Design a protein with these regions (language model features):
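Metal-associated gating/positioning segment near the N- to mid-region
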Residues: 53-120
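Short, well-ordered alpha-helix to beta-strand connector turns
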Residues: 7, 43-45, 101
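Short amphipathic alpha-helical surface micro-motifs
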Residues: 5-6, 27-30, 49, 110-117
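N-terminal metal-binding scaffold of metallo-dependent hydrolase/deaminase domains
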Residues: 1-41, 54
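A generic local structural motif
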Residues: 9-11, 34-35, 46, 90-92, ...
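Short, well-ordered secondary-structure micro-motifs within conserved domains or adaptor modules
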Residues: 44-49, 53
């Protein structure tokens, strides 16, 4: 199924901002970015992005996915069972993605549980 996103700005991630362009997505992949005129006759799903900007997914190179903002995160983790830590980390991963961050580099948590979270997210 193809979806055309159009109406707002398109930022390409290397410094260019485009007006009057559309972004065509087939399934999970971007298949085209072009002036809106190139999409005349498109009959698939259309999403109006007016008053918005489409941009590539962001990368956060310093996260601790198992932490949830506690004042003393290491002590807090010691009170939790591994299953609770993994559930919290999965929730944090989902929040991260919903905020536009599509890639992270985790710098450690507890008992390497972040690797289980990585594997679950990648499956």
């Amino acid at each position: 199924m193809s979806t055309l996103y159009s109406g707002g700005l398109v930022f390409d991630g290397i410094g260019n901002m485009f007006e009057n362009h559309g972004v065509l997505v087939d399934g999970q992949k971007i298949s085209g970015i072009a002036p809106l005129g190139d999409f005349e006759g498109f009959s698939g799903e259309k999403v109006d992005t007016s008053d918005g900007t489409l941009l590539p997914g962001l990368i956060d190179c310093h996260v601790h996915i198992v932490y949830s903002g506690e004042a003393d995160p290491k002590s807090h983790l010691l009170k939790l069972k591994p299953g609770q830590i993994v559930i919290n980390a999965l929730e944090n991963a989902q929040k991260t993605l919903l905020n536009g961050i599509t890639s992270i580099r985790d710098l450690g948590g507890r008992d390497f549980l972040e690797f289980a979270v990585r594997d679950a997210c990648n499956s």
